[in-house]
């Protein structure tokens, strides 16, 4: 399926989805959870393992002996200590946890990288991305299906330029990640806001009124009554979204809606790990302090064996 067919299919699917009276579109960007486990260190350290390693890598540590687990953890600590001062700070731990938290994003970028890096130089230029994505349209700007791809391409180019911090129109892997997942980067949040405003602000007055807000997430189906969640969203708009009560959301109000300041779970977990492992209470961790508490950070066959006994007893 070429790009035109894909986008037309996507448009039809979107239209079909929006026609369902009870289906809701959610534009709010939330941080992914650190783990789906309960955080209860009195029972086990599964939550901490997922937060520190990521859920998939945490499973692999359950197959290691304690000695193997400690050795592998030591190698991870060397990578976390980015300034190579022999200590792991709360900030360095937070960065590690954030990376594990967003592993699915990095995996998504890796899966797409080879498709766009046409000359295999480890970078993706705007020309490479445009040619792969819009090559068919560039060859035939007036397609038979009548679909106009130019606005989409212009929007992509604007976002690419925003992600490209040094302005050379060539994206590193980190810049390409920011292009594909702008909501994850502080310096890209303005473009997320701009694109959202363009999508919802139908009369282009620079604001989102109540009907535009509801219309973006709900398509009214003839004479059918509005579902309860739509009535709730109307109340949310009046009571919470429209903070200055002028009947519409400006850019700041819209930004607060789609990019809320969530509780920072990664920071809280980093603080917890330091508190539990910092034997000399100097506010930072040595490699030895971390490895001594390997069961908290990563676990092993031994720690999982204890949990397995509990699970066996439950059966």
From Swiss-Prot:
The keyword Membrane applies. Ca(2+) 3 binds at residues 164, 166, 168, 175. It holds the Pfam family EF-hand_8. Belongs to the CREC family. GO terms for biological process: peripheral nervous system axon regeneration. Keywords: Calcium, Endoplasmic reticulum, Glycoprotein, Golgi apparatus, Membrane, Metal-binding, Phosphoprotein, Repeat, Sarcoplasmic reticulum, Secreted, Signal. The modification Phosphotyrosine is found at residue 47. Residues 1-19 form the signal peptide. Involved in regulation of vitamin K-dependent carboxylation of multiple N-terminal glutamate residues. Seems to inhibit gamma-carboxylase GGCX. Binds 7 calcium ions with a low affinity. Ca(2+) 2 binds at residues 117, 119, 121, 128. The modification Phosphothreonine is found at residues 65, 254. This is Calumenin. Residues 68-103, 104-139, 151-186, 188-223, 229-264, 265-300 form the EF-hand domain. A motif (Prevents secretion from ER) lies at residues 312-315. Its main location: endoplasmic reticulum. It is found in: Endoplasmic reticulum membrane; Golgi apparatus; Secreted; Melanosome. InterPro entries: EF-hand-dom_pair, EF_Hand_1_Ca_BS, EF_hand_dom. Glycans are attached at residue 131. PANTHER family: CALUMENIN (PTHR10827:SF88), RETICULOCALBIN (PTHR10827). Ca(2+) 4 binds at residues 201, 203, 205, 212. Ca(2+) 5 binds at residues 242, 244, 246, 248, 253. GO terms for molecular function: calcium ion binding; enzyme binding; enzyme inhibitor activity.
């Amino acid at each position: 399926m070429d790009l035109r067919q894909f986008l037309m299919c996507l448009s039809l699917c979107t239209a079909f989805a929006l026609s369902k009276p009870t289906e809701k579109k959610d534009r709010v960007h939330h941080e992914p959870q650190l783990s789906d486990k309960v955080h209860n260190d009195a029972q086990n350290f599964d939550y901490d393992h997922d937060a520190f390693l990521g859920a998939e890598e945490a499973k692999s540590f359950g197959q290691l002996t304690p000695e193997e687990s400690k050795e592998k953890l030591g190698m991870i600590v060397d990578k976390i200590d980015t300034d190579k001062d022999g200590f792991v700070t709360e900030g360095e731990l937070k960065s590690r946890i954030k990376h594990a938290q967003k592993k699915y994003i990095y995996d998504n970028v890796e899966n797409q990288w080879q498709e766009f890096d046409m000359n295999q130089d480890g970078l993706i230029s705007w020309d490479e991305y445009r040619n792969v994505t819009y090559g068919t349209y560039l060859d035939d700007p007036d397609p038979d299906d009548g679909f106009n791809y130019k606005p989409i391409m212009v929007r992509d180019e604007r976002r690419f330029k925003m992600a490209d911090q040094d302005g050379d129109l060539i994206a590193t892997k980190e810049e390409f990640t920011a292009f594909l997942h702008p909501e994850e980067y502080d310096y890209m949040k303005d473009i997320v806001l701009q694109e959202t405003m363009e999508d919802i602000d139908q009369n282009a007055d620079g604001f989102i009124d109540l009907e535009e807000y509801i219309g973006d997430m709900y398509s009214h189906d003839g004479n059918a009554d509005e579902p309860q969640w739509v009535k709730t969203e109307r109340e949310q708009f009046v009571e919470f979204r429209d903070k200055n009560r002028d009947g519409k959301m400006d850019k700041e109000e819209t930004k607060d809606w789609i990019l809320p300041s969530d509780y920072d779970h990664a920071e809280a977990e980093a603080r917890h790990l330091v508190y539990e492992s910092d034997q000399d209470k100097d506010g930072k961790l040595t490699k030895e302090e971390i490895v001594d508490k390997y069961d908290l950070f990563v676990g092993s066959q031994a720690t999982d064996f204890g949990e397995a006994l509990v699970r066996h007893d439950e059966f």
